[in-house]
Regions:
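N-terminal lobe/hinge region of extracytoplasmic solute-binding protein
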Residues: 71-122, 153, 222
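Detector for C-terminal structural segments
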Residues: 92-95, 233-238, 338-371, 421-431, ...
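Ligand-site clamp/hinge motif
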Residues: 218, 248-297, 427-431, 437-441, ...
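Extracellular/periplasmic solute-recognition and catalytic clefts
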Residues: 155, 159, 173-175, 230-241, ...
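Surface-exposed binding/hinge segments that line
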Residues: 130, 165-209, 226-233
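Gly/Pro-rich hinge or "lid" segments in bacterial periplasmic/extracellular proteins
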Residues: 105-109, 198-265, 271-273, 380-386, ...
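Aromatic- and charge-enriched surface segment that lines or borders ligand/interaction sites
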Residues: 116-161, 177, 183, 325-327
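Structural transition elements
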Residues: 227, 320, 355-397, 417-424
């Protein structure tokens, strides 16, 4: 799994989480201008033609040649799509140079991109793609079926140990039928395949470049996309220049040729607090906003603020099921009632979030608010005390919670460092449990060390945040043995397996509802909230569009100044 779990479990954790709105966010605004028109007028009984100045309303025409400057939350270790699951790296790869066979439209349906069409076998275990002809990688080599096979085979190769492997499900082989036909064969139907392939897992890079650069390819990536890498100054910036031979085949991008902007500059700005200044000085064009600074930009005529509430993330507590008492569903239920979700929304996220009861993000297919309400556990500390008592935990006269052996209860809750609002959520959890007489020690570490530590047993609970636009995220987290090899087998396993092999969208959504109920009935986690995605755009940025997976579509972007 990953620093950001993947493209389908997609983008996890970090501050720069992309919005998932699918409509253009910043279209050119009509403005009043004075022009000279030739008009026909009547003068003393005769018709004459003359020129006069008139005031009209017009929309500025898009112009090219701009340099677009955006923020990078961190300097990627590599831009090799096969070897990374970093959110930051995935965003750079997907947005600027590496395209896929399919993309998802604003309604959440797969559409052809580098593929022209596809056919699915009757038993749904073979998918055959017809590829577009005449497409070139930016190094001048051909995109074809052999290139598709080369890229996917790298992910399938156990020796490569690609973190993308889990997103190919039961895929057994990729076969070249002819130069522009490629066939994927599965052991069993795999419902998340198309959405996984629309993300970085499905990136098709130049085999020639990958072979030429070998282990250094991640610093010299080549795709069929609208931009090509120019310069990479480690720790400072990455610069891309326009691919002048580019062809755009997506129908959600107006410009079908080379992108309007000449260059893309990605500035490495890791500090959350620096984003405000970078926006105010015009150093960057767009900035994703932490909850603390949203109010600063709302109402400022120099910016447009976009707030997306239909998000695909959930912040939740996970248990170390290998340790008592977290192997006891009664204790997990008690903890769930002990958490004041609204306090976390208000105190940790300044109100820019929504309470969550379901383990599935509210923006995902299959999410049902009725299920979340019926099976959710609203804040009720008295009920939490009663459940703890049923599990053998009691409060003594001093209000200290004692375990069944009569010892004071003390737990360690861990998470990752560097994300202010996650840390504040931890503090709410700590305070809620302290109110019940439970001592909680908080511990954070940088992402890599934190995630690695979860394979061990030196923790009791951890606060996690996942993002994904597909319900298969539930499989990745909860299907035993779980993403950190701690999850026990349970009735949810068979349901999750069925959801992953159910290809009909309606039937799959019903299956996903069953999975949510099973996970909630077994108290497999404590969902707390889903935070909104918020960003500010300089008011002169035009046609800034985010797609279904949260990726920028740079081809139409231009600066109206």
């Amino acid at each position: 799994m990953n620093k950001q779990f993947s493209v389908i479990f997609a983008s996890l954790i970090l501050i720069g989480l992309l919005a998932s709105s699918c409509a253009p966010q910043s279209q050119a605004t009509p403005e009043t201008i004075t022009v000279i028109q030739t008009v026909v007028v009547e003068k003393e009984g005769e018709t004459v033609v003359e020129e006069r100045q008139v005031v009209v309303t017009a929309t500025p025409e898009p112009k090219g040649g701009d340099t677009l400057v955006f923020r990078l939350e961190e300097d990627p270790e590599t831009l090799n799509h096969v070897l990374t699951n970093s959110l930051t790296a995935n965003n750079v790869i997907a947005q600027y140079f590496c395209e896929r066979l399919v993309y998802y439209d604003g309604q959440g349906n797969p559409q052809p991109w580098l593929a022209e069409s596809w056919e699915v076998s009757e038993d749904q275990t073979q998918i055959t793609f017809k590829l577009r002809q005449g497409v070139k990688f930016s190094d001048g080599t051909d995109f074809n079926a052999a290139a598709v096979k080369y890229n996917i085979d790298l992910i399938l190769d156990p020796a490569v140990a690609s973190p993308k492997l889990s997103y190919l499900g039961s895929l057994q082989s990729v076969d070249v039928v002819d130069d522009y036909t490629v066939q994927f064969t599965f052991e069993e139907p795999y419902a998340p395949f198309f959405i996984n392939m629309s993300g970085v897992t499905g990136c098709i890079a130049s085999p020639t470049a990958m072979q030429q650069w070998g282990e250094e390819y991640g610093r010299h990536p080549v795709g069929t996309g609208p931009y090509k890498l120019d310069e990479w100054i480690p720790g400072s910036q990455i610069t891309f220049s326009r691919n002048d031979n580019y062809q755009q085949f997506r129908t959600d991008v107006v410009n079908t040729g080379a992108p309007l902007a000449e260059k893309i500059v990605l500035l490495v700005i890791p500090e959350e607090g620096t984003v405000q200044a970078a926006l105010e000085t015009g150093e960057i064009l767009v900035g994703y906003l932490a909850a603390d600074i949203v109010a600063r930009f709302v109402g400022d005529p120099n910016f447009r603020v976009v707030i997306d509430k239909n998000v695909a993330n959930v912040v939740f507590l996970e248990f170390n099921f290998k340790k008592a008492p977290f192997d006891d569903p009664k204790v997990r239920e008690a903890i769930s009632y002990a958490i004041d979700r609204q306090a976390a929304v208000n105190a940790a996220w300044n109100g820019y979030a929504e309470i969550a009861y379901s383990p599935l993000p509210l923006g995902d297919p299959g999410f049902d608010p009725a299920v979340a309400t019926e099976y959710g556990t609203p804040y009720d500390p008295e009920k939490a005390k009663a459940l703890f008592a049923e599990a053998g935990f009691i409060q003594n006269a001093e209000g200290v919670m004692l375990d069944p052996a009569g010892q004071p209860v003390s737990w360690k809750v861990t998470s990752y460092a560097g994300f202010t609002h996650i840390n504040r959520t931890l503090e709410v959890v700590q305070a809620n449990l302290k109110d019940l007489g439970i001592e909680v020690t908080l511990e954070t570490a940088e992402w890599g060390a934190f995630y690695e530590s979860l394979l061990g047993d030196d923790w009791d609970m951890e606060l996690m945040r996942w993002t994904d636009r597909d319900p298969s995220i539930l499989n990745g987290i909860y299907r035993s043995p779980g993403h950190r090899e701690k999850t026990p087998e349970g009735p949810y396993d068979a349901i999750l397996d069925r959801c992953n092999t159910t290809m009909d969208p309606t039937e799959r959504n019903e299956c996903v509802k069953e999975a949510q109920i099973s996970l909630m009935e077994n108290f497999m986690s404590v969902p707390i909230l889903s935070n909104w995605s918020m960003y500010a755009v300089q008011n002169y940025v035009r046609d800034y569009t985010i797609d279904y997976l949260g990726y920028l579509l740079p081809g139409d972007v231009w600066l109206d100044k």
